[in-house]
From Swiss-Prot:
InterPro entries referenced in this protein's UniProt entry, alphabetically: Fcf1/Utp23, Fcf1_PIN, PIN-like_dom_sf, PIN_dom
Quaternary structure annotation from Swiss-Prot or TrEMBL: Part of the small subunit (SSU) processome, composed of more than 70 proteins and the RNA chaperone small nucleolar RNA (snoRNA) U3.
Task of the protein: Part of the small subunit (SSU) processome, first precursor of the small eukaryotic ribosomal subunit. During the assembly of the SSU processome in the nucleolus, many ribosome biogenesis factors, an RNA chaperone and ribosomal proteins associate with the nascent pre-rRNA and work in concert to generate RNA folding, modifications, rearrangements and cleavage as well as targeted degradation of pre-ribosomal RNA by the RNA exosome.
Source organism of this protein record: Mus musculus
Record-stated family: Belongs to the UTP23/FCF1 family. FCF1 subfamily.
Domain of life (superkingdom): Eukaryota
Keyword hit for Acetylation: no
Annotated region described as Disordered, given as residue ranges: 22-47
Compositionally biased intervals (Basic and acidic residues): 37-47
Localisation: Nucleus, Nucleolus
PINc domain sequence ranges: 67-166
Protein name: rRNA-processing protein FCF1 homolog
GO cellular component: nucleolus; small-subunit processome
Keywords tagged on the record: Nucleus, Ribosome biogenesis, rRNA processing
Amino acid sequence: MGKQKKTRKYATMKRMLSLRDERLKEKDRLKPKKKEKKDPSALKEREVPQHPSCLFFQYNTQLGPPYHILVDTNFINFSIKAKLDLVQSMMDCLYAKCIPCITDCVMAEIEKLGQKFRVALRIAKDPRFDRLPCTHKGTYADDCLVQRVTQHKCYIVATVDRDLKRRIRKIPGVPIMYLSNHRYNIERMPDDYGAPRF
């Protein structure tokens, strides 16, 4: 008996008129949309994002010492694993003064990782690191870094994440610092800096 009542309860539906129903008044009725015919001879409009004036083709003129380097979460973790001092290794790679920058999203991501990554958190809170405030919603660090780099072309992105590297390679004029063979390397740098590749 109880089972029948339940099924009857779910089976009852609120019956509503369709917006195309003839019983509705003319003004309330939904009119069928007519498809516009496309003219094949018309020129197609394309939206191309305007590139900043600091770019000369792929060469970014805003990059210069002291270098501002946006650091990702996994870059700090892998640097600790490789026993590298972040600031000193960056200077060895670029032969110039480097200012590591860390966004609120990256900081929140490191804090979420918990007790296991407390060394990374201590390094991220180093006074030599610049703290960049985030105004957007959410704390997904990859989106935050990509958005910041797209807006301002004065940063180098330090990451080991393949997906993030792939996304940043699509943005012209942004170099990527990564870790290989226990040293930092840099790709897409306008001047030929970087540790030698073996």
